[in-house]
Each structure stands twice: as C-alpha cells, then as structure tokens.
UniProtKB/Swiss-Prot annotation:
One of its GO terms (biological process) is tRNA threonylcarbamoyladenosine modification. It is found in: Cytoplasm. GO terms for molecular function: iron ion binding; N(6)-L-threonylcarbamoyladenine synthase activity. It comes from Bordetella petrii (strain ATCC BAA-461 / DSM 12804 / CCUG 43448). Gene3D superfamilies: 3.30.420.40. The keyword Iron applies. This is tRNA N6-adenosine threonylcarbamoyltransferase. Binds 1 Fe(2+) ion per subunit. The lineage of its organism: Bacteria, Pseudomonadati, Pseudomonadota, Betaproteobacteria, Burkholderiales.
Length: 348
C-alpha cells in the first residue's frame, strides 16, 4: 500500500510517499525560513500562503522521484494538528482534494505522533516498548510507547518548550531567526562555565520540565552586559554555550530518570531539538552505564517533514488504527490536540 503524506503545520511544507511494505520511497521539503527571517518569527498568514504555492509542486516532485503516478497511490495522509490553523487547513485541503479526485481514503495524523514514530524510519529500528523524548519548539514531553497508538504521558513542560528556550534565548542575544540552530553553532566556540545558569526542576524528582526561569536568567545576563557596553563576541558565545548546556543537562537527566523509572532500555528522541549534537553526545554517554540506547531520526527528518506523516499513517494502517473508508472528506483540523486523544485505539 502506498500513502502520500502532507505536512503543513507551521513553516515547512513537506510531502512524502511511503509504502507499507518498502518504507520511505521519496520525500521533498520546502522551508520558509528565509521568508520569515525579516520578521524574527513565523507569520501565520504568510506561512499559509506559501503552503498553497508549494504543496502541489512538491507532491508532483515526490511522485516523479518515486516513479509513481496518482493511480499508484492507495491513500493520502495529512497533519490534522496541532499547529497553525490556517497552515493546517492548507495541507488538509490539498490532501482531501487528492483523495477526492482518486476516490481514496484520507487519513488525519497527529503531528506529534509523526515525530514520535519518525526514528522508526531508520535502521536499526527500535522495538517496542520504549521511552520517547519529544522535544521541539512547541513541545517537550516524555512518553512511554508500548506500540502504535499506545502512548502514556510520563512528564511534560509546565511552561515553555525546550526549543522555545533555545529560540527565545537566541533572540535575546541578537542571533536572529531561527534562533536555536544559530545558538548551537555559536555555543561550539564558547565556554559554558563563564555564566552560571539555573537548571529548572533538575532535582524535582518527577519527569516534568520548566524552562521559563532559564529564559529569565538569560535575559538578566544580557541586561547586565548591556549596562557594561553589551555582549562582545566572546561573551555572546559563552552565554550561548551556558544556555545550551543548561537545557541539555535537564533533558538528559529527565530522560535517564524516565528510563530508570520504567525499567526500559530504549530511548527514542524526536523533534527539532533532537538534531542538537550536544544532546546526542551527552545522551549516549549517560545511557551507556544503564545498558540503554538512544535512537534518533536521520538529521534530515528531525524538522517537520512529510515523511513522518506518511510513515505514521502507514504504521496506523498496519496496526488497524486508521479508517480506509473512501469518501470521508472532512476539513476539520485541530490547532490544539492532545496526543492522549488518539490513544484509545479507535481509528483516527
């Protein structure tokens, strides 16, 4: 079975073709970073308009690269939420139009489930059960995953996501947009010991997170530097390194605690922050004494992408959790959508 998947929840337009038997066949991605840079962040209306321009050409590109025609597609999948309402509606409309034209089923997919399952696209594929660390600009959660559609929340951020802490801290340092990757690049040349920053909830004993206090601490350091003439290049690099070290230390500690509490030996890390090299290195070090292992999606699939949506749909089909009835062309999207809502075992 071949599924054509569409992702349009924020500022990336992604399309992919996945086979339930052969895996990922082709995928294409367009990022809107250049368009949003002058505004310092994502402008929802501009994002929606760009998705309209990109979705169909990307679909044609994917089909051509996979050597497929529309007649070869058996189902269509799309991100139904969470995300920006207008952006989600574009992806849903395009996917539903493809489905209607060919009389195919259209499968709505939860954006976070796409991220959560994306490391299964790579080899070696982790077996169930495992602990998942979902860490991005909008979400920071620890989940126990016992199978497709079988997710239990272990802990989550009580305020800001880790990715937001990266992005907002970078903006405070004048690093531009997108801030997280810029901060990580600058941190490579900095000394994290120069600035003492808090590790919020590091010793709380639970698996929840909080990053708002860290952002406030970074703001305080920036204002202190401004009173003395501002951050020079060395100080900016050191503050970036200290910020990254604080975020990563908390993520690693909570992930290790989750493995110990569950007794599991496999950790799946997904979401944009999963591309962070320091996080990957320190997790590998921390898990080694436990006899545990971390699994990451390929770097190209850490950001939002169509491959994870098509793949999540394929996994739901194989698990009997997706309706394959054609002719159900609802345009409902859910900008706010709890992952727990899809864990009851009913078709999406």
């Amino acid at each position: 079975m071949i599924i054509l998947g569409f992702e349009s929840s924020c500022d990336e337009t992604g399309v992919a073709a996945v086979s339930t038997e052969r895996g990922l066949l082709a995928h294409a991605l367009h990022t809107q970073i250049a368009m949003h840079q002058e505004y310092g962040g994502v402008v929802p209306e501009l994002a929606s308009r760009d998705h309209i321009r990109r979705a169909v050409p990307l679909a044609r590109q994917v089909l051509a690269e996979a050597g497929l025609g529309l007649q070869d597609v058996d189902a269509v999948a799309y991100t139904a939420g969470p995300g920006l309402a207008g952006a989600l509606l574009v992806g849903a409309s395009v996917a539903q139009a493809f489905a209607w034209a060919r009389g195919l089923p259209a499968i709505p997919i939860h954006h976070l489930e796409g991220h959560l399952l994306s490391p299964l696209l790579d080899d070696p594929r982790p077996d169930f059960p495992f602990v998942a660390l979902l860490v991005s600009g909008g979400h920071t959660q620890l989940m126990r995953v016992d199978g497709v559609g079988r997710y239990a929340l272990l802990g989550e951020t009580l305020d800001d996501a880790a990715g937001e802490a990266f992005d907002k801290s970078a903006k405070l340092m004048g690093l531009g947009y997108p801030g997280g990757p810029a901060l990580s690049r600058l941190a490579a040349s900095g000394d994290p010991r120069r600035y003492a920053l808090p590790r919020p909830m590091l010793h709380s004993g639970d698996l929840d997170f909080s990053f708002s206090g860290l952002k406030t601490a970074v703001l305080t350091r920036v204002k202190e530097a401004e009173r003395d003439g501002g951050l020079d290049d060395a100080a900016r690099a050191d503050l970036a390194a200290a910020t990254q070290a604080a975020i990563v230390e908390v993520l690693v500690a909570k992930a290790v605690r989750a493995l110990k509490q569950t007794g599991l030996k496999r950790l799946v890390v997904a979401g944009g922050v999963g591309a962070n090299q320091l996080l990957r290195e320190l997790l590998a070090q921390a898990l080694r004494p436990l006899g545990a292992r971390a699994y990451f999606p390929p770097l190209a699939l850490c950001t939002d992408n169509g491959a994870m949506i098509a793949f999540a749909a394929a996994e739901r089909v194989k698990a009997g959790l997706a309706s394959l009835q054609a002719g159900q062309h609802a345009f409902t999207v859910r900008p706010r959508w709890d992952l727990a809502d899809i864990c009851a075992g009913t078709p999406a």
